[in-house]
Amino acid sequence: LARELALKSDLPICPGLNNNEINPESLEKKCSDIGFPILVKSSAGGGGIGMQIASDYSQLVEAIEKTKNLAEKAFGNSDIFLEKFIENARHIEIQIFGFGEKRAIHFYERDCSIQRRFQKIIEESPAPNIDKDIINKMSECAVNFATNQQYEGAGTIEFIYDRDEHKFYFLEMNTRIQVEHPVTEVVTNVDLVEMQIKFALKMDNYTSEQNDVNRSEHAIECRIYAEDPSKQFLPSPGKITK
C-alpha cells in the first residue's frame, strides 16, 4: 500500500514486485527484468526483521520461503514484496510533521546508512558527503507525500540513495515518533514530542511554518546492541536480579 500511495504522489520507488505480483509462472522473468541482487522484505515487518538478499533466482526462491515463514511467525502476516537491492547506497530519512488539511513541513534529514543486520546503528544530521540538491529534493518529496495523505503528527519518510546512479527511491514511512528523533531535536531546537501534544490539544504555540525551521547544530546518535560475541552474537541484555 505504501508503494502504491508513493506512486500516486509521484515519488520514485525502487524497482520491485508487490505481493500480488509474485507468482511462479512469471517470477523468474520479472526478476530478471528488475536485475539481481534482489531484496525480499516482509510487508508487515519492520526493524530489518526477516529481510533476505538473493544474488540469483535459486537463492530468491529460498529467500522468499524463509521470509514468508518468519513473517508469519513474527507478524501473523506472510505477505512479502521484492525490491532491487542497491549495493552502493545511502539510507536517508526525512523528519516531517503533518497538520492534516493538505499541509506539512520537514525538519531536515537524518543519515542512517551505518547499519548491521539491516538495523540502524548510527543516526546523524546533517548527512555528511551528500549533495544538498539531493537532500532538498528528498525533503520536497517527503512533504508532498505527507501533504497528499493529509497526515497528522510527526513521521519519518525514508529513502534509499543509489550512489552509483545518483538516484533516490522511496522506502517507507514510519507513522510515529522514532527513537532517533532526539537527533532532529538537537539540530533544530524543536521538541517534537511537545509539538505532538500541543497539536493534539489544538494549541497553537508551536512551530508550524517551514520558514521557522532552522538547523544550526550537528548531532550523532549511537545505538548500543547488547549481544554476546562468544555465543554467535545472541542477545545478551544482562542478568535480571530484581
Where would I find each of the regions flagged by the language model?
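A conserved helix-loop-beta module that forms one wall/lid of the active-site cleft
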Residues: 1-43, 50
